Amino acid sequence: MIKDKQALEGGRISILGARVHNLKNIDVEIPRNKLTVITGMSGSGKSSLAFDTIFAEGQRRYVETFSAYARNFLGNMERPDVDKITGLSPVISIEQKTTNKNPRSTVGTTTEIYDFFRLLYARAGEAYSYLSGEKMVKYTEDQVLRLILDEYNGKKTYLLAPLVRNRKGHYKELFEQIRKKGYLNVRVDGELKEIFHGMKLDRYKMHSIEVVIDKMIVSEADERRLKESLKIAMKQGDGLVLILDAETNEVRHYSRRLMDPVTGLSYSEPAPHNFSFNSPQGACPKCKGLGQVNLLDMDKIVPDPSLSIYSGGIVALGKYKNSLIFWQIEALCQKHGVTIKTPIRDIPEEAMDEIMNGTDERLQIKNDSLGSSNYFLSYEGVAKYILMQQESEASASAQKWAGQFIKMATCPECNGWRLNKEALSYRIAGKNIAELSAMDISELYEWLEGIEEKLDPKQLRIATEILKEIRSRLRFLLDVGLDYLSMNRGSATLSGGESQRIRLATQIGSQLVNVLYILDEPSIGLHQRDNVRLINSLKQLRDTGNSVIVVEHDKDMMLSADYVVDMGPKAGRLGGEVVFEGTPKEMLRVDTLTSSYLNGNTEIAVPAERRKGNGQFITIKGASGNNLKHVDVSFPLGTLICVTGVSGSGKSTLINRTLQPILSQHFYHSLEDPLAYDVIEGIEHVDKIVNVDQSPIGRSPRSNPATYTGVFSDIRNLFVELPESKVRGYKPGRFSFNVSGGRCETCKGNGYKTIEMNFLPDVLVPCEDCHGKRYNRETLEVRFRGKSIADILDMTINMAVEFFENIPTILSKIKVLQDVGLGYIKLGQPSTTLSGGESQRVKLATELAKRDTGKTLYVLDEPTTGLHFEDIRVLLGALNKLVDKGNTIIVIEHNLDVVKSADYLIDMGPEGGRRGGNVLFTGTPEALAKSGVGFTAPFLKEELDIANKKK
């Protein structure tokens, strides 16, 4: 018994009695130092087991090691509902959700590769002058002495020490100090002058001042005198001296610091922070290291010039209100001979400029609200107010408000490089640090391969170890399929899958051992071509001496794992059990929903015929945003279109950043600007665009499927019509848990109360008054067919379909939720507990329930994220229903089950990043498979061949 226990705790992670969310008191054993895949349908309990049980307990144990004082600042960790977990190593979770939105965070800073770049340039970079382009030089005093003796031998010269360079001031005190030290001459703004008592300059002009340390005819005989004078000049000039040729009046600079010998420009000794755009010493002074500056978008501030300011022509101000800013604008208009009711297009340009940008003139404010008093006030303008809200530490809502009137433009000073001129003037093998950061990872890796040959011996000695670290980290990024990214790519622009794989590469590079890693679908956004490299990376993490748990649905990942835990049998209340645990080989021999898809007994069938569409097209011509190569693309309407291609090939740029914003601006006056394109045709053939993504349907537990689909309003209206409600005079608000009246006021309609436990985790307990039902006693007394409003919210969709079968207005909205495979979730289930796949299907169901014209364009970006084979089958059924109504669906997808089910494919590539951005193929899946063009074709051909063999 003791031996078994030791084996269990030493070789396995043992979870006993897990009851988090829908887990049904399950026991699971996961082998340590192995690659384990947890799979199952969406909502079956995979994430509840991996993240909400195993990771949550690991994190809680870590925090428990801190003192009570430290835990007070860290926040409380809730104890997961589990009896016991043994064999748990320190846990690191690598999820998709934690994308960094900080504009200063880049791929380079996240992976720490940019830190090594900074070190490399600070220690081995060659400095060049940003004024003349000359290589910067620095000398010792002995070298300067030798150079002067060689270059000026026999010439009459002045030895100068610079004191002031291009600064305003009268410098009366400085001249007096120089005079008292015994110096007789100075050079002011290029002119030699004798110092006199009371000497001063024009204080409002820029001046350069050098003191004449010595004047002499240079000769070897006077070497000692020159050496002494040079020493004094170096001290006075802080390491910099000038030699003035008395005959030609030419000046040459010499410095102990890095210096341009032509212009005298000098740099301080470089340090790593001089190359950081997050440091004042390295950042571009104009954009503060962001690479972009805020500019006002006048088309968004004044979208309709035919309106007057009074009528709300300046959208940022809205319609006229009795407030100071409108009184000031009235005064400005009066000054220019117009009124606040004049159409904006008829207001003089000078007047509009002052309204937007302010005026130095103090305006006389007259208004009835001020009585007979007159006020004279300065006016700063609408523009300054908007920019102030955006750039100051205003509230998030104020910044969001200002953001809609602002467009980001590339910084004109640094051209988007983020760094100051000095930092950009250091080079290694002809490249500055920003140019390296702009290279794709694959391109950068190739460039670094031959770099040693281009370095001098000193540089090579310094750079060898740094280059080794950089190459190592780049190799890990290449292994996880991120060859198309660049170091300067902003973290905020990365997809969840990309940011997750970056963190995975960083963890592999950290070489930690005895750690438990938990990953959430790392294959998201990854083309089949790159899947093998990802799997090898996970195995490398395992072989280093770590345990790896992956929540995944990818077939190749499951078959490559050491161990598989299959959750099910279905989802929600019908899930939460372990239906299989063992090796992939063992799994293929058992009868579960997952194994039936893996062994080929069940499959998603290829459509018998492809839709041809309605003969109409939307065509984009000349799309050139990001890496798109000025492409022309036509989308056949009335079909299911799938956009494919390797990661970074331009799929999202074409659909999410070009097509969707064009249509959103056309139909909804959206504020998001599309990326560059020449023209769009056929826009009249659709009447709206809908993006069905996997984002939550609500941000608070008060949001649920009933409220999102709108069926809750119908249910509340039904309750209002009941005789009991009419007698009591109840209105629809009575049956809402969000407003006072019908809700339980003890818990404010939450159904539970939060008990603060100080240094222990907060505890959620059911409300003692409503017992979790959210409503007060009087509201719950009103019943329909024996059920209160709380009972109905507690029903699953399947139960609700039966219950409301005779009420068409309610049934139509609930039935579609059942049709998309969500029969197991509750009507009142908090939106925060729904998975991404479940949220997406709630949105799809809502669209299916709408009465539509058959002219809608739907966009879905990787809808199979988080979906099991069975979920994908149901999803495709829902998508096909929408297309059968005449609508058009564009799906960005790598999943071959979706690709083979499409009517029309647009394959992008051939590679990612700069080597992508072309349309390789358009046509049916069969035609692409036959063509052999690009990386998608061979995988699709294999999939279609398997399907054809089974027919």
Functional labels for PLM-detected ranges:
Residues M1-K951:
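Conserved phosphate-binding elements of NTP-dependent enzyme cores
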